[in-house]
Amino acid sequence: MASFSQVINPMTGQNTWQERGDDYDYHQEVANAGFGDMLHDWERNQKYYAALRKTIAAMRKAGKEVHALDIGTGTGILAMMALRAGADTVTACEAFMPMANCAARILAANDAAQVRLIRKRSTDIQMGIDMPHRANLLVAELLDTELIGEGAISIYNHAHQELLTDDALCIPARATCYAQVAQSPLATQWNSLKVLPSLDGDILLRPPAQLMECSGEAALHDVQLSQLPPNSFHTLTEPAQIFQFDFQRKQPREQQREHVLRLQLSKPGSVELVFYWWQIELDDAGEQLLSCAPYWAHPELQQLQKSFKDADRPLPNIVPWRDHWMQAIYYIPKPLQLHQAGEQFWLRCYHDEYSLWFDAHKEQPEQPARRHSCSCDLHLTYTRNRIGQLNQGTRNKRYLAYLEQAVQQAKPAHVLVIGDGCLLGLASSALGACSVRCLEPHRFSRRLLESVAKHNKLKNVRFLESLQQLEPEELNTLTHIFAEPYFLNAILPWDNFYFGTLLLQLQQQQKLSESVEISPCAARIYALPVQFLDLHKIRTPIISCEGFDLTLFDEMVQRSAKQALSQVEAQPLWEYPCRALAEPQLLLSVNFANFGVEQHNQGCLELTAKGNCNGVALWVDWQLAANNSSKSIVSTGPLEPIVPGQFVKWDMFVRQGVHFPSQTDDQTHLKWSTTLRPLLGELTFNFSLQASHEETK
C-alpha cells in the first residue's frame, strides 16, 4: 500500500506530495546507512581480524573460555571473525532492524548460525534473558570521526557495568586523540566573513562588529585533511596527544574532561585551526594500530610507501582511505597572532559525552570556559561551503566585474537581487546602483544582510520577504535582476534553477520590460566520466570481506538504493581525487529569459583515456552576461581545463553531482539522456556505460 509524503521541491520552492511505498523510509535508511565503505576498509578489517585471532588465542592459552560480545554487529562481520578465530560463544546485538534481519541471513550463509543474535540496543540487553552469562571479550566498532559522537562513552560504561566480566578484554582496547595546530587562509574562509573588495581593491563591504566578535560554532568540520592542497596551510606545532580513552577499564569513562596543553610554535603564525584525528590500539599489547591521521602525520607512511604497488597514486592517497572515519577541523574562537618560532601558548581541549571543542590562549587560563556558539547568524544560517563561497576571491571578482559594468552602463541602475545571503548583490549599492531590492525570505539570512547594510551605511537598500512585496512602480523601473544564484534549500548545483522559477513568478505579477537585464542569463550542465581512486566504494558491492560472503548485504543495499537514492547525489569532489576519462560533455543549456521551456537531450560520449569509469561528475556553469566571454562564466565544477587521463582540480566551496554506474568494466562509451520539466521542478538524468560494439544500438 502506498502513502504520500510532503517534500519541498528545491527547483519550484513548493511543498509537493510524492507517492511512496510504506517501506520507503526503511529503504532510505538502508541505502544511507553507510556500512559499505566501512567494509571496503581493508586495513580496518584485517587489523580487527588479527587482533581477534591474537586475543582469543592468548585467552585460550591462559586456560580461559572465550565468550565474545559484538555490539552493533551490522553485517555480523566481527562476530563471524570472533567465531572463526576460536571463541567458544559469540553474541551479537544490532538495533537497526533491517540490518539485524540481514545479519541473521548472512550468519546462516556463512555457517555461523550459532552466533546468538539479539535484535536490541546493547543498553537494552537483559542478563539471564537475552544473554545467559557475561562476556569476557567485547569487540565493537562504535566510533565516528570525533571518536565519541555515536555514544561510545555511555555504551562502554554500560557494557562494563552490565554485560562484561571484571577481567574482560576489549577490541579496540584504547584510543588516543591528537590535535595539531595550524594556520590556513583557505580553511578560515569556511568559518568567518572577510571584507569584500572591489576590483580596484577598495573595500565595498565590511563585516559588522557582531560578525568580527563572534566565536563561531564549536562543532567539527569533518574533511579529508589529506586532500587539502599542501600550499594552503602551515602546521604550527607537532601533533599532540590530547585525550586517551581506555575501553578496557572497568571504572567508568569520564563524560566530560578538560585538558590544557602548553605548546610551542615550530614557526610564527596565526593559531587559527586545530586539525584533529585519532588512533586506536586494537589489541591489549598495542601491536595492532589503526590511525586516522592525515598522510603527513601517519605513523605508518613509510611502510605504506614501500609496500604500495600503484606508482600513479599520489602520496596523500597512499594511506588507507575511509569515509566513515575522517579527520576534522576545529576553529579557534579568537585566533592568536604569534610572531616568533619557539613562542609558547596554551591549547584548551574539551570533550563531553558526544563531542569535542578547543580554544587557545597566550597565558595559562584559570577559569573553565563554556562551549562557544554562534552569536552573529552567519554560522547558524549557512553551511561551511556557503561561507567559503562568500569569501571566494576569484569567484567574487567575476560577479563584481559584471556588476560594475552593469551599474555604470545603466545610470540609474535599479537592481533586484534574488537569492539567500547574496552579499554580491548587496554590493551593487556600494558600486553606485540607484536602488537595490533584496529578496531574502529566510529570517536569519535577512537579519544578517540587514546588519551588513546598516554597518556599511547603504541607504538605498530594501529587503523583501517575498516578490509580492514589490510595488508595480518598482517593477517598472527595474533595470537589472541579479543572482549568483544560491538558495538555502539547494543540495545539487541545479537546484538553484529556482532562480528561473522566481523569474516566471515575476512575469506573472507584471510583464517585465525586455530591456531588463537578467544575470545569470543562462546555465549549462556538464558531465564528465571519471575514475575515482576511492569514492566509488561507498556504492560498490562488497561481495566478500576477509573470506566471508556478504552478497546478501549487497543485494539488500542495492534493492533499497533503487527505491530511495536518486540517480545523482551531491559530493564535495575536491576531497575525492579522480581522473578525467574524456572531455566534458554539455548535457543541457537553460535560458533564464525563457525558463519554462521543457527539454530532452541525449547523446553518447567516447571515453578517450584509459581507466575504469566508476563515476560521472556533473556541475553547472553560470553565464553572467550574454557576451560569451569565458570571464563571464562562474563554474561550480573544475577550476582548470580538463585533460583526459589527468586528475581534476575541483571547486572547494560547492558540492558537485555524482552518478555511480553499476557496470564499469571494459566500457568505452557513456550513453546519456536528460529531461528538464521546469514547471514541475523535474530534472532527470540517465547514464549507461557501453562497450564499443554496443554503442550504435
From Swiss-Prot:
Give the keywords, sorted.
Answer: Methyltransferase, Repeat, S-adenosyl-L-methionine, Transferase
Q: Which GO terms describe its molecular function?
A: histone methyltransferase activity; protein-arginine omega-N symmetric methyltransferase activity
Q: Does the UniProt entry include the keyword Repeat?
A: yes
Q: Which InterPro entries match?
A: Arg_MeTrfase, MeTrfase_PRMT7, PRMT_dom, SAM-dependent_MTases_sf
Q: Which domain of life is it from?
A: Eukaryota
Q: Name one GO biological process term.
A: peptidyl-arginine methylation
| Residue ranges occupied by any SAM-dependent MTase PRMT-type domain in the UniProt entry | 14-357, 366-697
Class in the EC hierarchy, top level:
transferase
The record's EC number reads 2.1.1.-
What does the similarity note say?
A: Belongs to the class I-like SAM-binding methyltransferase superfamily. Protein arginine N-methyltransferase family. PRMT7 subfamily.
Give the function comment from the record: Essential arginine methyltransferase that can both catalyze the formation of omega-N monomethylarginine (MMA) and symmetrical dimethylarginine (sDMA). Specifically mediates the symmetrical dimethylation of arginine residues in the small nuclear ribonucleoproteins SmD1 and SmD3.
This chain belongs to which protein, by name?
A: Protein arginine N-methyltransferase 7
